[in-house]
Design a protein with these regions (language model features):
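Alpha-helical bundle regulatory/interaction domains
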Residues: 1-48, 55, 60, 72-101, ...
Length: 142
């Protein structure tokens, strides 16, 4: 599997395998994912995976995962009454400082400022409902 086309992009035969790894990152974004796990899902070495993923998606796997986590955090901050600290943990960050820094870098405002923008909108989903009904996407059987 593999090789590259003349334009430097990964061979078309590799695309479904990269998609499989990206789907894994999408499903398990809140879990600590390692590069070798994602590369194994694609069936290539981690070094080849890193280059191919970045060439196809325009982001490294780590940057893609961070972006996915922040997108999910935005959803939770907009639509639920879960605290910023709870959102931080739900989307896979173990440090509120790291989460807030990455959120501000990608969104342009702090998580608290972002959440405050939506405070007067439609009624928000209670945090207890988010946790009870698995809306946080976290696996319970882990």
């Amino acid at each position: 599997m593999g090789g590259q086309q003349a334009d430097g992009l990964p061979a078309l035969s590799l695309l479904p395998h990269l998609r499989r790894a990206r789907d894994l990152a999408d499903r398990r974004y809140a879990d600590p994912l390692r590069l070798d796990e994602l590369a194994a899902a694609a069936g290539v070495s981690k070094y080849h995976f890193l280059r191919a993923f970045a060439a196809v998606y325009g982001l490294t796997p780590a940057a893609y995962l961070a972006q996915r986590r922040i997108e999910r955090a935005q959803d939770l901050l907009r639509s639920s009454n879960v605290t910023v600290t709870e959102v931080c943990m739900l989307v896979g960050y173990s440090s509120l400082g790291s989460f807030s820094s990455k959120f501000r870098q990608l969104v342009g405002v702090t998580p608290s400022e972002y959440q405050a923008k939506f405070a007067d909108g439609a009624p928000r989903i209670p945090g207890c409902y988010v946790f009870m009904h698995g809306l946080s996407d976290r696996k319970r059987d882990g």
